[in-house]
């Protein structure tokens, strides 16, 4: 009851942060479990069809835990391989970024994630290991750059990096915002073509054109 009583409580102290993390997980997991249950009613266990029937909009990073949670559900409950679960999850996720300030991007302390969501952290570690191995092929020995792009680094889980790396579509909230994401905040991902980064025209953009 405490988890769902007050949405987004005060999080300037450790207990508040942990409660917020639990809320993020609670709501994303409930949503995904409902979606999978409904999908199976219509299409059985043919999860190759899931990306054609379900796209989950990660509107800012708050629901970003949907990424490791969907992988967990597909592996632990549905018996899929890691490779298939990761591929399906990538094709199901679309991320909208709302800030261009790196310091405002959501991060979670590794210790808190390990303590609160140990299985989710295991999945994040494996995603990070695989992603960094791929990044090393493009940026050999550029450890600072790879660390900047990593999902886990410097004692924190970087939710924006997770969302960019594991979403088939990434967009900003306006054309200018999207351009800034391409040119600065997510520039290294953009160079790799690791994500489909595009811009969403706002009503003002449309009026000017």
Regions found by a protein language model. Name each.
Residues 198-205:
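Conserved small/polar residues in nucleotide/adenosyl-binding loops
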Residues 1, 167-168, 173-196:
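Catalytic nucleotidyl-transfer cores of nucleotide-processing enzymes
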Residues 38-51, 74-87, 99, 134, ...:
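Secondary-structure transition/capping motifs at alpha-helix termini
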Residues 57-69, 92-96:
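Core structural elements
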Residues 29-33, 69-78:
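Alpha-helical support elements that line or immediately flank enzyme active sites
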Residues 125-155:
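Polar, glycine-rich mid-to-C-terminal structural blocks
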Residues 77-125, 129:
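Extended, well-ordered alpha-helical scaffold/bundle regions in very large, multi-domain proteins
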Residues 1-55:
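Function-dense linear segments that define catalytic or interfacial modules
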């Amino acid at each position: 009851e405490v988890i769902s009583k007050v949405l987004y409580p005060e999080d300037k102290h450790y207990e508040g942060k942990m409660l917020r993390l639990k809320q993020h997980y609670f709501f994303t997991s409930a949503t995904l479990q409902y979606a999978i249950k409904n999908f199976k009613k219509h299409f059985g266990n043919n999860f190759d069809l899931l990306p054609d029937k379900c796209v989950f909009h990660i509107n800012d990073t708050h629901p970003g835990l949907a990424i490791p949670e969907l992988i967990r559900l597909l592996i632990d409950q549905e018996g899929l391989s890691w490779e298939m679960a990761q591929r399906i999850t990538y094709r199901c996720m679309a991320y909208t970024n709302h800030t261009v300030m790196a310091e405002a991007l959501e991060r979670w302390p590794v210790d808190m994630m390990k303590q609160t969501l140990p299985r989710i952290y295991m999945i994040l570690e494996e995603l990070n290991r695989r992603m960094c191995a791929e990044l090393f092929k493009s940026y050999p020995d550029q450890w600072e750059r790879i660390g900047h792009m990593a999902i886990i680094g410097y004692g924190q889980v970087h939710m924006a990096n997770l969302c960019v790396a594991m979403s088939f579509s990434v967009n900003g909230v306006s054309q200018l915002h999207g351009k800034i994401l391409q040119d600065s905040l997510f520039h290294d991902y953009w160079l790799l073509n690791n994500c489909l980064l595009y811009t969403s025209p706002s009503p003002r953009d449309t009026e000017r054109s």
